[in-house]
Amino acid sequence: MIKISKKAKKYIIKLLSKQELGTNIRIFVDSPGTMYAECGMAYCDMNDIDKKNDHKFSFDFFDVYIHKLMLPFLKDSIIDLVKNDLGTKITLKAPYAKILNKSKNFSQLQNSIKNFLTTQINPKLLLHGGSVALYDITDSGVVFLKFSGGCNGCSMIDITLKKGIEKKLIKNFPEISSVEDVTHHISGKHSYY
């Protein structure tokens, strides 16, 4: 799934040696499946790991964690180390980061859900400076949403998603089986809570 060159492994181990014990690496994709997709790597401590949704890839002396929804976008990824006149940097090449596989009947259901999010959900989220957008729908009826603004990094996002948005979507669209969040959450001043 993910290949890391020997030089990149040594470099990552060196970087991790300067962090707290138990720190690993998280790989993510912002705006996956769009022309704006960007891959990234970040430090990941044990408290940041979601055992239910994160997939672990073990390497010598460290692990790499990827949210299960990001796996298709990071298929055949290569992490390498590049040295040039400006210094050394890690590169992450992900050939599928910008590719989105749309499911059957996506267009009709997509439009209905987008309209519902725009008229029923986003007006409430906008009160907190946030919004949500439809990201994808699978053949099995799983809806993927991406949060932004005040919702990104908000500590209440799981409750908002599961107790609010998911219940309303399933009630209004019986073909939906569940709703998942694909947002790469970063807490900050922009976050509502």
Curated annotation (Swiss-Prot):
Q: Which UniProt keywords apply?
A: 4Fe-4S, Iron, Iron-sulfur, Metal-binding
Q: Which InterPro entries match?
A: Fe/S_biogenesis_protein_NfuA, FeS_biogenesis, FSCA_dom_sf, HesB-like_dom_sf, NIF_FeS_clus_asmbl_NifU_C
The family database entries (Gene3D superfamilies) matched by this protein are listed as:
Fe-S cluster assembly (FSCA), HesB-like domain
Q: Which GO terms describe its molecular function?
A: 4 iron, 4 sulfur cluster binding; iron ion binding
Record GO biological process: iron-sulfur cluster assembly; protein maturation
Give residues annotated as binding [4Fe-4S] cluster.
C151, C154
Q: Which cofactor does it need?
A: [4Fe-4S] cluster
Q: Which Pfam families match?
A: Fe-S_biosyn, NifU
Which SUPFAM superfamilies is this protein grouped with?
A: Fe-S cluster assembly (FSCA) domain-like, HesB-like domain
Q: What does this protein do?
A: Involved in iron-sulfur cluster biogenesis. Binds a 4Fe-4S cluster, can transfer this cluster to apoproteins, and thereby intervenes in the maturation of Fe/S proteins. Could also act as a scaffold/chaperone for damaged Fe/S proteins.
> What does the subunit section of this Swiss-Prot or TrEMBL entry state?
Homodimer.
Designated name of the protein: Fe/S biogenesis protein NfuA
Q: Per the UniProt entry, what species is this protein from, by scientific name?
A: Buchnera aphidicola subsp. Cinara cedri (strain Cc)
